[in-house]
Design a protein with these regions (language model features):
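Conserved, single-site charged/polar hotspot
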Residues: 1-184
Length: 184
């Protein structure tokens, strides 16, 4: 298959879960290709849930692709109830964030003193997050804003580029989807 079952390919769950509808859709689109300005699109990307806005390729992977531009998606919020992972949040301690930065960004900023979104895209997605500590600071940019925190601790999972960061007490940070609020 050309599609994997990870977040790289989104929601594909393997041939074992195919059914009449999915088989018919595959058959109906056999031989159909996607073109942009007469050129075959060789890197068609998608996602199952965008949090309310897509994002420009330059803000995710750093290169400009004319057909991958960010747009607000008002439809998304109207069907959010259909997506079990649309609303999400997690809490992380300063010590956890420090360990993530050490292991995933190969940097030790010391005791974490502050974390904040330092840049938003035109569509309101996070494209830079700054971590400040007693030994310096580190700024994660583009896709790294999302992927940096994933995979080190089971309870930490940034599911999209559309989120907020809220500082709790001196050592607690709340991260949640852009539609939810944090209390605590």
């Amino acid at each position: 298959f050309d599609v994997c079952s990870t977040v790289d390919c989104q929601a594909y769950k393997g041939a074992a879960l195919s059914n009449e509808r999915s088989d018919a859709a595959a058959e109906e689109t056999r031989g159909v290709y996607l073109y942009y300005n007469g050129e075959l699109v060789t890197n068609a990307v998608y996602y199952s849930c965008n949090g309310g806005a897509s994002e420009s390729c330059k803000n995710v992977w750093g290169s400009e692709v004319p057909y991958l531009q960010g747009k607000l998606d008002p439809y998304e919020a109207s069907v959010a109830w259909r997506f079990s992972r649309y609303y999400w949040s997690f809490t992380a301690t300063g010590d956890e964030l420090r360990e993530v930065l050490k292991s995933e960004a190969n940097t030790d900023i010391g005791q974490v003193q502050n974390v904040y979104v330092s840049e938003y895209s035109d569509t309101g997605n996070v494209i830079a997050v700054t971590y400040e500590g007693t030994r310096g600071s580190y700024t994660a940019r583009r896709e790294k804003c999302r992927t940096l925190l994933n995979g080190v601790y089971d309870h930490i999972n940034v599911r999209s580029m559309r989120y907020t960061v809220t500082v709790g007490d001196a050592s607690t940070y709340y991260v949640n989807d852009a539609q939810s609020s944090v209390t605590g």
